[in-house]
A protein has these predicted regions:
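Charge-rich, low-complexity N-terminal segments
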Residues: 1-54
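Residues in flexible loops and secondary-structure boundaries
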Residues: 23, 40, 84-86, 114, ...
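General "foldedness" signal
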Residues: 24, 50, 63, 88-92, ...
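General N-terminal targeting signals
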Residues: 27, 32, 37, 91-98, ...
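Surface-exposed, low-hydrophobicity interaction/linker segments
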Residues: 44-112
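Mixed-charge, glycine-accented linear interaction segment located at domain edges/termini
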Residues: 113-152
């Protein structure tokens, strides 16, 4: 839980959605409401993505989870930042234009945490090289951060 909500491990990701279930169940939509901001703060320089950076929302998530009881459940759906996803796919010799998002779902069921990768494609394809590259890159990242895992 420290890697998820305290350390900077998942800061390079964007939050699509989260659900946290403790005494209450709280859904969080990670899509940014650009109308909330004045016109001069809505440009791509100020708000570069449609989704909120996980680093800006993890404090709220931590506040919802902290306490003397462990949460009953939580789920975070994260996207790799588009520029980082494109660089990783290009390095793996995969056309980044075929991918809408590289997705990481982190789900805790009260006993164990499961990380699931996925690729959101622009269109249907039988080629799964992007999935393979994303799986490989995430395993390398988890190893680099010292996070142990078991492949299912």
């Amino acid at each position: 839980m420290n890697h998820l909500l305290v350390a900077d491990t998942f800061d390079p990701f964007l939050l699509e959605e989260a659900t946290i279930s403790t005494a209450l169940t709280v859904p969080i939509d990670g899509h940014i409401n650009k109308d909330f901001y004045p016109a001069e703060e809505r440009g791509e320089d100020c708000i570069p993505w449609e989704l909120q950076s996980f680093s800006k929302i993890k404090g709220l998530c931590f506040d919802l989870i902290k306490g003397k009881h462990t949460p009953l459940y939580f789920k975070f759906v994260l996207h790799m930042q588009p520029d980082k996803a494109a660089a990783m796919l290009t390095k793996a010799q995969v056309d980044p234009d075929i991918i809408r998002a590289l997705v990481l779902t982190i789900r805790y069921d009260g006993e164990k945490t499961v990380l699931t990768t996925g690729c959101a494609y622009q269109t249907f394809t039988m080629d799964k090289s992007a999935d393979t590259a994303w799986d490989k890159a995430l395993k390398k990242y988890l190893d680099l951060k010292g996070i142990s895992y078991e492949e299912l």
